[in-house]
Regions:
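A conserved hydrophobic helix/loop-capping motif in glycosyltransferases and polysaccharide synthases
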Residues: 2-14, 18, 25, 35
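Flexible acidic/His/Gly-enriched loops in nucleotide-sugar-dependent glycosyltransferase catalytic domains
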Residues: 66, 94-158
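Conserved short acidic donor-positioning loop in nucleotide-sugar-dependent glycosyltransferases
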Residues: 10, 22, 37-39, 62, ...
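Glycine-rich, basic loop-to-helix element that forms the pyrophosphate-binding segment
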Residues: 58-75
């Protein structure tokens, strides 16, 4: 049924806990494909599990996007799921998705909310994806209203048909993938209402760089390939500022306020102006405002 693709780079210590978490699935209708992206210490799986585990090691570092592509190409099952080594699936995720797919046989893409935990701040919120009938390039250019790779399932043949994740990008690869995906004429989506993936986020994490060079390159690439109309440009200009603000706000940097001021100038939204001032005063306070709205947009 499913092949779960797990890219890993220099985090082999996370793999045993991830695999152990998957033993709690209510059905074992899946296998796991771990793609070790040329880690300094190779990923090794010596324990046996109630599902098949395949480890593929890249001879050179390829990046997360190509590692997922390699996993997809080597997947044995019809459907692909994606899991990062520090995220977790709900215990009934594979069963619920299988039930949906059995009932809706014309579907080739499934997605669902995620429960996101802000570890340092001590609270969580649930994302709020749009409905399938609302999905369009215009809506996604305004914001990724579907979710990241751990929140989706896609048929392998469709994934490969559209070329998988772009290896030309080192940022926003999942966003670019969704823009490609929704333009395919065979695209047929189904939304599951429950959050079926648990994601953790750490502010001030050393792995989150405030260097937005790759993000800006990805924004330029997406603008060139997908923005065709004045309305699309208007939408994407706003989202671009959000995406540039993200690494700064996650590093609790007041520089994020600059991007929120830019959003205010584009939207004339008082809410964005207030956010900009709050970020300028205290980025940590701005993040904690999510406590007031536990049901959040993606």
């Amino acid at each position: 049924m499913f092949s779960i693709i797990v890219p890993s780079y220099n985090r082999k210590e996370e793999i045993p806990a991830l695999l152990e978490s998957l033993t709690k699935q209510t059905t074992y209708n899946f296998d796991v494909v771990i793609v070790d992206d040329c880690s300094k210490e190779p990923v090794e799986v010596t324990q046996s599990y109630p599902f098949a585990v395949k480890v593929i090691r890249n001879e050179t570092n390829q990046g997360a996007a190509e590692s997922r592509n390699i996993g997809a190409r080597n997947a044995d099952n019809e459907w692909l799921l994606f899991l990062d080594d520090d995220d977790r699936f709900a215990n009934d995720k594979c069963q619920k998705l299988a039930d949906v797919i059995a009932e809706h046989t014309d579907v080739n893409f499934v997605y669902h909310p995620a429960k996101c935990e802000m570890v340092n701040e001590g609270f969580s919120y649930v994302t709020n994806p749009i409905e399938p009938q609302e999905i369009s390039v215009e809506r996604i250019l305004l914001a990724n209203k579907i979710g990241g790779m751990p929140m989706i399932g896609v048929k392998k043949d469709l994934f490969l048909k559209i070329g998988g994740l772009s290896t030309a990008l080192r940022s926003l690869e999942d966003y670019d993938f969704l823009l490609k995906l929704v333009q395919d004429p065979t695209f047929k989506a189904y939304k599951v209402a429950e959050p079926l993936t648990y994601c953790t986020f750490h502010t001030k994490r050393s792995s989150v760089s405030t260097d937005t060079t790759n993000t800006q390159k990805a924004i330029d690439y997406i603008r060139e390939h997908y923005v065709k109309t004045a309305e699309q440009e208007k939408n994407f200009a706003i989202n671009a500022e959000y995406m540039l603000a993200y690494p700064h706000i996650m590093n609790l940097s007041r520089k994020a306020a600059f991007y929120y001021f830019e959003i205010f100038k584009l939207t004339k939204s008082i809410k964005q102006l207030v956010i900009a001032f709050v970020v300028l005063i205290s980025p940590k306070l701005a993040i904690n405002l999510k406590r007031l709205d536990r049901k959040s947009v993606v």
